[in-house]
């Protein structure tokens, strides 16, 4: 493993606009893209609607499918029946179901990726700002290729957990493989 790469986040995004703003700042690097997925998981643990919107923005386009308008659009007056122009990309249902299942079983799981959090304290958050520690290794790949595997430090786990990010069409880095991030941690 390489020297740690530390990404600092002043606070958790409170809404989709704050998430997108932070993403435009952080996801210009592979580690920033990985942290955006961790923040989306944290948002999901707090608020399912916000979390789903953030997850859809944090994952690579190849991991999305066209779906009906999201629930928030419906609440804001969108037509109940989708039209071609209202069909929005959404996460693949199987991916979303697995994430929901894991997070609902351990809502503190996203906190395990924040420096200073420990199982002994019930994964209680430290004071903001929040710091995420990531590493690369000789198998991480070259970011110039548009694909990079990073390893996120995780309290309550045997070691860092891998996440693969890819540069998307808009040049931002987004997660394309994250299953190890949602595996249970020590209670």
State each model region's role.
Residues 5, 27-30, 154-160, 167:
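Ser/Thr/Pro-rich, low-complexity mucin-like regions
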Residues 55-58, 120-121, 186:
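Short, surface-exposed, charged/polar-biased interaction segments
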Residues 44, 137, 155, 168-170:
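Generic structural motif
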Residues 103-158:
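Acidic, glycine-rich flexible loop segments
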Residues 158-187:
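Short beta-strand edge/turn micro-motifs at domain boundaries
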Residues 2-113:
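Core segments of small alpha/beta cavity-forming domains
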Residues 35-42, 149-151, 160-164, 174:
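Ordered hydrophobic segments in well-structured contexts
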């Amino acid at each position: 493993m390489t020297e740690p790469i530390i990404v600092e986040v002043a606070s958790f995004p409170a809404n989709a606009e704050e998430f997108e703003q932070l993403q435009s700042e952080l996801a210009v690097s592979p580690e920033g893209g990985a942290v955006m997925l961790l923040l989306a998981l944290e948002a999901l643990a707090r608020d399912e609607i916000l979390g789903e919107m953030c997850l859809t923005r944090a994952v690579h386009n190849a991991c999305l499918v066209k779906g009906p308008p999201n629930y928030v659009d419906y609440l804001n007056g969108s037509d109940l029946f989708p039209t071609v122009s209202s069909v929005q990309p959404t996460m693949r249902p199987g991916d979303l179901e697995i994430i929901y299942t894991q997070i609902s079983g351990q809502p503190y799981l996203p906190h395990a990726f924040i420096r200073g959090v420990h199982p002994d304290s019930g994964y209680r958050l430290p004071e903001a700002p929040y710091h995420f520690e990531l590493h690369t290794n000789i198998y991480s790949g070259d970011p110039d290729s548009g694909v990079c595997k990073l390893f996120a430090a995780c309290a309550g786990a045997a070691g860092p957990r891998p996440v693969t990010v890819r540069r998307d069409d808009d040049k931002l880095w987004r997660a394309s493989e994250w299953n190890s991030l949602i595996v249970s941690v020590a209670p």
